[in-house]
Structure formats: structure tokens, C-alpha cells
Regions:
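A short, conserved alpha-helix within the catalytic core of class I
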Residues: 150-159
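Helix-to-beta-strand junctions that scaffold the AdoMet/dcAdoMet cofactor pocket
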Residues: 150-151, 164-166
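Class I SAM-dependent methyltransferase SAM/SAH-binding core
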Residues: 79-130
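Conserved alpha-helix/loop element of class I SAM-dependent methyltransferases that forms part
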Residues: 48-67
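Conserved class I S-adenosyl-L-methionine
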Residues: 68-76
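S-adenosyl-L-methionine-dependent methyltransferase catalytic module, highlighting the catalytic core
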Residues: 154-155, 169-298
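A short beta-strand submotif of the Rossmann-like class I SAM-dependent methyltransferase core
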Residues: 143-146
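A short acidic, Gly/Pro-enriched loop at the edge of an enzyme's catalytic core
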Residues: 129-140
Length: 303
């Protein structure tokens, strides 16, 4: 392991060498052939507490985390769960079933949470389609890069709204498959019209195994999101705050693209477009074409 766990750690999360090794040797090696990312970098990016703070900053543009009761759908390796408890004093709960490419995530999360002297049993082995909590339980329901991996994303959205308190905030971050880049495969692509087409693109254009692509819910896009939220609103009124287009424009204007995982290639492209002076125009054109990514589905449950 070339990554120093002590240097990766922050005051809000102690990253252990054991966690780094476990992620590198499982998820890191699994995704190395898909993303073309070194397993050590994958492990470091997965467990970097600074990423959890970046996510919190986006969420806090809509609501304060301080002291809130928060459910994270897809806790992953537990870093958000730890950082948000220690930095924002939240009451944190999480769901983390293990799936394709992520078989040891629950075990890593619980061990890391325990190493940070927090309660590992707050992370439940459960799926977003059947959230094991009563109605109106949480101030915030949050998820990042999970919705595209579930069996029934529409049901996950309905369940997330169900357990959200009136006045609470929902934020779901996920890829937009009307966009032009897939981070799971570090692949540029035209807007995806079907999973079959996506598998074909990954197999024949990028010459990679399409097995993981077959698990992706490529129907997720802004049109799908607005339709689902509208249907939910018939029974549970919601106010949709954003689908992330403003954040996309801001990042494109500033050439502020994360270097996490395989996003470095995208960041270099955006920097090049900025040097050409066309990044601002292109950002707004992409939004008109509904191709921004990621989707940042943010809504409040009306009181």
C-alpha cells in the first residue's frame, strides 16, 4: 500500500491501514479494469474524509446538517457516516447492502466506524426499496452514486420520501445517462437510450467487459427524475429545489471538476475548454440538452 493512512486521516475521520488494504484488494482491483484507475488511488479516494466534506458542502447549500437526524442510503465504506457525525453532530443512520463490485463494503464500514469509536450497528444491512424505518423519521435523506445501482430506483425515491419528515430535505446524487461521460468506466459516450446500447458501447468502443454496465440503471436522467417526483407529489407534496444544473454550470464556469477516481480525465477536458474560452457557452448548451452530470436531485417534503 503506497498510501499513508495517517496522512489521509483528518480530525473528523481516522482512516486505518486495514481499511485501505481491504478496499484496494477488493473494490480497487475490481474497478481497475473498468476505470483504468490504480487500486491504491481507488482506495485512497474512496476513504478520503475530504470527499465527505465536499459532499456536505453541496448539501448545505440547501439545508444545515448541524444536529440533524440523517439517513444515508448507501453508506459505502462509512466515511460520510463518520465525518458527518463528528463534524456536524448529526444522528447518523445508514443502509448498505453489498452488491456487484462492493461485496465487502459493509464489513469495511463497520470496522472503520468502530475504529472511530462510533456505533457500527447504525449501519443496517438493508436496501433502499424497503427502508426499515417508520414514516417521517429523518430530517435529511441523502444518497450519492447509489441510485444507478439499485433494482428499482423509482421505489427507492418513494421510500426516501416516505421516511423523510415534513419540512425535511432529500438529496440524491447520481449519474445522468443523457450526459456524455460515465465515471464507472471513465468513458465518454452519446446520450444513453437503453442499457443494451450502453453495454454495446462499453464492449465495442472501449473494449471492456460489459458485465458491470449491465447492472446500471441507465434510464436515470432529468426527464425520468422529474416524472418520478411528480408522481410522488400526487400523494406526498414535494418542492423540487434543483436537479443539479446550477452546480454543473458553476463547476464548468470555474473549471472546478473533482479529481476523485476517474474524473481527472474529465477535469482535463474542462480545463482545455476553458482555455479555448467556450466552457461557459458549452455548459449552458449542455443544460438545454439535459446532458449535465451528475444529477443532484434535491427536494423538500412539504409540511
Amino acid at each position: 500500500m503506497t498510501v499513508d493512512a495517517a496522512k489521509l486521516s483528518t480530525e473528523f475521520c481516522t482512516v486505518t491501514p486495514e481499511a485501505l488494504t481491504a478496499v484496494r484488494d477488493s473494490q480497487g482491483k475490481y474497478f481497475a479494469s473498468l476505470m483504468k484507475v490504480d487500486p491504491d488511488k481507488f482506495a485512497a479516494d474512496t476513504l478520503d474524509p475530504r470527499k465527505a466534506e465536499d459532499m456536505a458542502n453541496v448539501l448545505e447549500e440547501y439545508t444545515s446538517l448541524k444536529g440533524k437526524k440523517v439517513l444515508e442510503i448507501g453508506t459505502g465504506c462509512g466515511v460520510n457516516h463518520i465525518v458527518w457525525q463528528k463534524k456536524y453532530d448529526i444522528e447518523a443512520w445508514g443502509l448498505e447492502p453489498e452488491g456487484e463490485g462492493f461485496e465487502n463494503s459493509t464489513d469495511v464500514a463497520r470496522k472503520l466506524i468502530r475504529a472511530n469509536r462510533l456505533d457500527p450497528l447504525r449501519v443496517k444491512d438493508a436496501v433502499g426499496e424497503a427502508i426499515p424505518f417508520p414514516d417521517n423519521s429523518f430530517d435529511i435523506v441523502y444518497s450519492s452514486n447509489v441510485l444507478e445501482h439499485v433494482i428499482n430506483p423509482a421505489k427507492v425515491l418513494r421510500e426516501a420520501v416516505r421516511v423523510l419528515k415534513p419540512g425535511g430535505t432529500l438529496q440524491i446524487v447520481c449519474p445522468n445517462y443523457l450526459s456524455y461521460f460515465d465515471g464507472h468506466h471513465a468513458a465518454f459516450h452519446p446520450p444513453i437510450i437503453s442499457n443494451r446500447f450502453f453495454r454495446w458501447w462499453i464492449k465495442w468502443i472501449y473494449r471492456r467487459d460489459p458485465a458491470f454496465a449491465a447492472t446500471i440503471r441507465t434510464e436515470i436522467n432529468p426527464l425520468w427524475a422529474r416524472r418520478q417526483l411528480k408522481e410522488i407529489s400526487y400523494s406526498t407534496p414535494l418542492t423540487v429545489l434543483s436537479l443539479g444544473e446550477e452546480k454543473f454550470i458553476e463547476r464548468m464556469d470555474q473549471a472546478d471538476v473533482s479529481q476523485w477516481m476517474a474524473l481527472g480525465i474529465l477535469g482535463r477536458l474542462v480545463s482545455f475548454l476553458r482555455r479555448l474560452g467556450i466552457n461557459r457557452f458549452l455548459a449552458r448548451l449542455i443544460v438545454v440538452l439535459r446532458g449535465w452530470t451528475p444529477l443532484i436531485i434535491t427536494a423538500t417534503k412539504n409540511t
